[in-house]
Amino acid sequence: MSFVGGGADCSANSNAIAQFNKHTQQDRSLQRQAANQQGIVQNGQGFKKDSMMNERERQNMDQFMNNGPSQSNFQFQPMRHELNMIQQNHKQPNVQNNWTNEFQTNSPSPVQRNTPLAKTGSPANAQWATEFQQPMDQTFNQSNQQQFNNMPNMRMGGYRPMMGMSMMGGGMHQQQNQMQHQEQNQDHQVDWDNQFKEIEQLTNETKDAEAEQVKGEEEPEIVIDDKYQATFQEVWDSLNSEEVENDFINQQYEEFKNTQRDSMPADMAQWEKDFAKYASTRAHFGDYQFEDNQHNQFLDLPKESDPYEIGLQLMENGAKLSEAALAFEAAIQRNEGHINAWLKLGEVQTQNEKEIAGISALEKCLELHPENSEALMTLAISYINEGYDNAAFATLERWISTKYPQVADQARQQNPAIDDEDRFSLNKRVTELFLNAAQLSPNSANMDPDVQMGLGVLFYANEDFDKTIDCFKAALSIKPDDAVLWNRLGASLANSNRSEEAVDAYFKALELKPTFVRARYNLGVSCINIGCYKEAAEHLLSGLSMHQVEGVQTDASSTLNHNQSTSLTETLKRAFIALDRRDLLEKVKPDMDINQFRGEFSF
């Protein structure tokens, strides 16, 4: 029996149909996977359709089906002829890019070069191949950014190609082609790092060009709302007006020094001359502005009723400070020389967070009674609050000269004239006076709390808050029920970044005097500093509500505007901004209705 052309299964009783059936039932999944195309196996079978056979092929088929075993079970010549025809009709396209030429030279694909199978593919693969064959420069210029951004979890510098597969050609070859490529082309290695570096360099150049183009474009004009323009203009005008005012004050001070230097009486004490010189550095706050008659019900009291006494009773009973202020105003309007009424009016207005009105009243009190120690101490603290340090130091020196004349006279004998206008020198000199006064009563039982108060103010001006706190605590050991001292201690603690302790001091002051508006204002500021914005707003609204007097209606033309507190409203705006409540911020304005906030805040 001959094995030549006999096939793998030869026997005496061999049946060609059975052999053919067995042959066609063999597992050819690898071959089908390698082809994976529709050009050769259009209908998933190995034969052409009858309509596609020529006459010779049909005769061979009939002869094969009708006759017994032939000398050769299979005739592959016609099929080989067809494959050669397909190869001739599908020539490889000319590649126009150097990168792809190098790619084909270094890593030739056996399927592409030796068989026509790789040239026949699905429409998707054919479209991809067409895009691949376009010039690389054109491709990157058009869509390089989009292509690289769409690569998930891949970085150009850290990518290593697997099994020799190009990142750009992952859809062309299947697993069998990759295995053949690895087996037959191990000697050809592609320098992928250089290829990707070139691509990355090209991409970076494109990005730089786009960045330059964007940078060169003109930025769009920013349109600012008219409301913010008006606000900016208002702030700018206020700054300019403040600068003009400061220049005017400095000019007045220079004129005062030139004209008043030789005009002081010869018998005037040196401390009085210094006070006149340094106190003039402050702004002139003008005369006190009284409320309109229609807004002050105490003006209508019968003559036998004393508005001054009523004001004292209101303060003692915990009434609103604004009501007590109206009573003292009525007493002054009855008698403009009422020294105590001016003093109490100044103290009430400073505690009511109306500093300017309080300063005007205290200055009037000192004009009537220059040696009033209570007015001097309160006025010095108000000057510190407003930033007139030299005027405050001169006022404190006047307080020492009034209450402890022996200390001031001894200092004047050692240094008769003071020509240095430096605030630090003035502070040092006045501090030495207060220290000398404190040494007169070293025993804590006989300690003068006002001396400790003055020392605390001097240390406060130098921002030595630790010493300030010690002085105020020493004063509180003598006067533990003084709400004003507790408030000043709280302010010192707050300025030394001890806001929690400051809150406790403010609460103590409010416990002693619930209508103490300045303590409520300071408490609101401390709440803002520790992030309690809603509580801060409630304290500030409570302070503003205490400025209102029952039965008194205010309007924009009322002189009440002269004695309103801007610090309360401005700090309330800060609290609303911190709460991100722009809707409430727009409601904060002079003569606003406080009751509109009661729905959200408790005060």
Swiss-Prot record:
Where's the motif WxxxF/Y motif 4? 271-275
Q: Which molecular function terms from Gene Ontology are attached? A: peroxisome matrix targeting signal-1 binding
- Quote the InterPro entries the UniProt record gives: PEX5/PEX5L, TPR-like_helical_dom_sf, TPR_rpt
- Crosslink feature (Glycyl lysine isopeptide (Lys-Gly) (interchain with G-Cter in ubiquitin)) location: K22
Entry-linked Gene3D superfamilies: Tetratricopeptide repeat domain
Where can the motif WxxxF/Y motif 3 be found? 192-196
Query: Per the entry's comment, what about the domains?
Result: The TPR repeats mediate interaction with proteins containing a C-terminal PTS1-type tripeptide peroxisomal targeting signal (SKL-type). The WxxxF/Y motifs mediate interaction with PEX14, promoting association with the PEX13-PEX14 docking complex.
> What name has this protein been given in UniProt?
Peroxisomal targeting signal receptor
Q: Name one GO biological process term.
A: protein import into peroxisome matrix, docking
Which segments show compositional bias classed as Polar residues? 31-45
Instruction: Write out the similarity annotation.
Output: Belongs to the peroxisomal targeting signal receptor family.
- SMART domains tied to this protein: TPR
- Identify the stretch(es) annotated as Amphipathic helix 1 (AH1): 11-33
Q: Where is this region: Amphipathic helix 4 (AH4)?
A: 232-248
Q: Is this entry keyworded Zinc-finger?
A: no
The record's note on quaternary structure and interaction partners says:
Interacts (via WxxxF/Y and LVxEF motifs) with PEX14; promoting translocation through the PEX13-PEX14 docking complex.
Q: Where is this region: Amphipathic helix 2 (AH2)?
A: 58-76
Placement of TPR repeats on the sequence: 304-338, 339-372, 449-482, 484-516, 518-550
Modifications the protein undergoes after translation, according to the UniProt entry: Monoubiquitinated at Cys-10 by PEX2 during PEX5 passage through the retrotranslocation channel: monoubiquitination acts as a signal for PEX5 extraction and is required for proper export from peroxisomes and recycling. When PEX5 recycling is compromised, polyubiquitinated at Lys-22 by PEX10 during its passage through the retrotranslocation channel, leading to its degradation.
Give a single Pfam family match: TPR_1
Q: Where is this region: Disordered?
A: 23-49
Role this protein plays: Receptor that mediates peroxisomal import of proteins containing a C-terminal PTS1-type tripeptide peroxisomal targeting signal (SKL-type). Binds to cargo proteins containing a PTS1 peroxisomal targeting signal in the cytosol, and translocates them into the peroxisome matrix by passing through the PEX13-PEX14 docking complex along with cargo proteins. PEX5 receptor is then retrotranslocated into the cytosol, leading to release of bound cargo in the peroxisome matrix, and reset for a subsequent peroxisome import cycle.
Compartments where located: Cytoplasm, Cytosol; Peroxisome matrix
